[in-house]
């Protein structure tokens, strides 16, 4: 029997940008950000350097081994090797769950994430998973990936009233990867892309930035995240 009331659960997330700053020896910048108590323009001196760190965070992500390899070597090729190994491990793990048919569905959804986010309309489209795919065929696999913590499904909210759930569009949602570094590697996007001015905010039509914001918010949220559109 499960020991009800005797087990404490803890959710694990990728390392945050704050932890990345500390790992890079930039605790002063982390302290500066932590001291902000209102929305205000960041002085150019801090802004330029924070964006430099953010570019590296987008490239490496927050998976502990990948971040550790970056701190140890400063070699993005070694970081890419770690990220590729992680992605390969996930795929191999899919094979253990539900037989060949379920493995195919898990892999197809997982490998479609970067393509889905690169679309002009970033709403999740089942047909982008496999031509002719329907929700009823793949919903169980999508739920498995979410329960495993590999993806986050974010519902479209059409209202803004209370409760938010009353205004959810149950047919429209976006799917994000657990980590921006894994997303970059999954998309086979070279880290040098983020060396270009503002590329971190524009690649994948801004979805890398969206994925980062969600990744930063999730450890702080006590409710399911939503998105809205003005279209």
Which residues fall in each region the model found?
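Accessory nucleic acid-recognition modules appended to NTPase machines
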Residues: 67-231
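Interdomain motor-coupling "hinge/lid" segment immediately C-terminal to the ATP-binding subdomain
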Residues: 2-118
